[in-house]
């Protein structure tokens, strides 16, 4: 194999640096907010870990607020017996009428699958849960979890595959998050009163500390701000994400996920809504 020239080596170094910068440093983008040392940023800002023990969990939040965007995070979840643990990754605004977009990963006993719990809150109202099993082991390696939020819809994606869409149906009286900036939050915590098999399986603290890892954060395609008056450019030259909806191929992918891996859908829970399903269920 031919040796690299100096020019080639510099080009390769520049490319690697660009890849590193595009992934986003956790030092630059996030603050650890709780856990008393149980959350740590390592590997020169490229990896963040959250841990949970019997005393406390841990968590972090973004420095920026976002009003629409395509946000990626690679995550590797708690391995082994993770029963009773919840790894939450979500966007949320503040106040009593907050908006929120949720990924929550509910742990399970060894050999049993995680449950991916999703929800959308508008004006402080949620009750829009959809739950899934994953088609891979989320503890064996990192996988990418994406929220694409624009004026038209909110799309939840796993490794680029859409699993759920919440459309803007304001014209039909359904509230839609479009005016309240949100921060990104994530935490690892214990909720064994409900998280695993409805609370039947409790956390086995002999397996603690539990740990989840994060890397390759990407918020390049976003409208964001770092202060009330400091809005960052919304990448006007590359903002195809701002008007993205699912194409026919992506609808096919989502149908595959929902047919084969969905385990709960609020839009089919007639017992929960005896007076009639939420309006959007008949529109989406």
Swiss-Prot record:
Say where the protein is mainly found: secreted
Its localization reads: Secreted, Cell wall; Secreted, Extracellular space, Apoplast
Annotated catalytic residues: 100 (nucleophile), 104 (proton donor)
Q: Where is the signal peptide?
A: 1-24
Tell me what PTMs the record reports for this protein: Contains at least one intrachain disulfide bond essential for its enzymatic activity.
* S-S bonds: 223-234, 267-281
Q: Record's PROSITE patterns?
A: GH16_1 (PS01034), GH16_2 (PS51762)
Q: Which SUPFAM superfamilies match?
A: Concanavalin A-like lectins/glucanases
Q: Where is the GH16 domain?
A: 25-214
What GO terms in the biological process aspect are recorded for it? cell wall biogenesis; cell wall organization; xyloglucan metabolic process
What does the UniProt keyword field contain?
Answer: Apoplast, Cell wall, Cell wall biogenesis/degradation, Disulfide bond, Glycoprotein, Glycosidase, Hydrolase, Secreted, Signal, Transferase
Q: Does the keyword Nucleotide-binding apply?
A: no
The EC number(s) attached to this protein equal: 2.4.1.207
* Gene Ontology molecular functions: hydrolase activity, hydrolyzing O-glycosyl compounds; polysaccharide binding; xyloglucan:xyloglucosyl transferase activity
Task: Identify one Gene Ontology CC term for this UniProt entry.
Answer: apoplast
Annotated xyloglucan binding lies at 104, 117-119, 127-129, 193-194, 198, 272
Glycosylation sites per record? 108
Instruction: Locate the site labelled Important for catalytic activity.
Output: 102
Fetch the Pfam families from UniProt.
Glyco_hydro_16 (PF00722), XET_C (PF06955)
Which reaction is the catalytic activity of this chain?
breaks a beta-(1->4) bond in the backbone of a xyloglucan and transfers the xyloglucanyl segment on to O-4 of the non-reducing terminal glucose residue of an acceptor, which can be a xyloglucan or an oligosaccharide of xyloglucan
What biological function has been recorded for the protein in this entry? May catalyze xyloglucan endohydrolysis (XEH) and/or endotransglycosylation (XET). Cleaves and religates xyloglucan polymers, an essential constituent of the primary cell wall, and thereby participates in cell wall construction of growing tissues.
Family stated for the protein in its record: Belongs to the glycosyl hydrolase 16 family. XTH group 2 subfamily.
Q: What is this protein called?
A: Putative xyloglucan endotransglucosylase/hydrolase protein 13
The protein's organism comes out as Arabidopsis thaliana (Mouse-ear cress)
């Amino acid at each position: 194999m031919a040796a690299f020239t100096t020019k080639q080596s510099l080009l390769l170094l520049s490319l690697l640096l660009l890849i590193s910068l595009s992934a986003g440093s956790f030092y630059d983008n996030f603050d650890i907010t709780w856990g008393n040392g149980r959350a740590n940023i390592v590997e020169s800002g490229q990896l963040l870990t959250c841990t949970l023990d019997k005393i406390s969990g841990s968590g972090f939040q973004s420095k920026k607020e976002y009003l629409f965007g395509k946000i990626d995070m690679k995550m590797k979840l708690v391995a082994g017996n993770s029963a009773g643990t919840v790894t939450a990754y979500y966007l949320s605004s503040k106040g009593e009428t907050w908006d929120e977009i949720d990924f929550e990963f509910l742990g399970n006993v060894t050999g049993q699958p995680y449950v991916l719990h999703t929800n959308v809150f508008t004006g402080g109202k949620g009750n829009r849960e959809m739950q899934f099993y994953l088609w891979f082991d989320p503890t064996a390696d990192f996988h990418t979890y994406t929220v694409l939020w624009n004026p038209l819809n909110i799309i939840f994606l796993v490794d680029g595959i859409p699993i759920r869409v919440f459309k803007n149906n304001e014209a039909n009286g359904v509230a839609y998050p479009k005016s309240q900036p949100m921060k990104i939050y994530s935490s690892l915590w214990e909720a064994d009163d409900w998280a695993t098999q409805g609370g039947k399986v409790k956390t086995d603290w002999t397996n603690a500390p539990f740990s989840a890892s994060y890397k390759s954060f990407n918020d390049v395609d976003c409208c964001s701000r770092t202060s009330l008056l400091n809005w960052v450019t919304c990448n006007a030259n590359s903002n195809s994400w701002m008007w993205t909806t699912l194409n026919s191929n992506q609808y096919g992918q989502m149908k595959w996920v929902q047919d084969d891996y969905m385990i709960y859908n609020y839009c089919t829970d007639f017992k929960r809504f005896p007076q009639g399903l939420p309006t959007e269920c008949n529109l989406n």
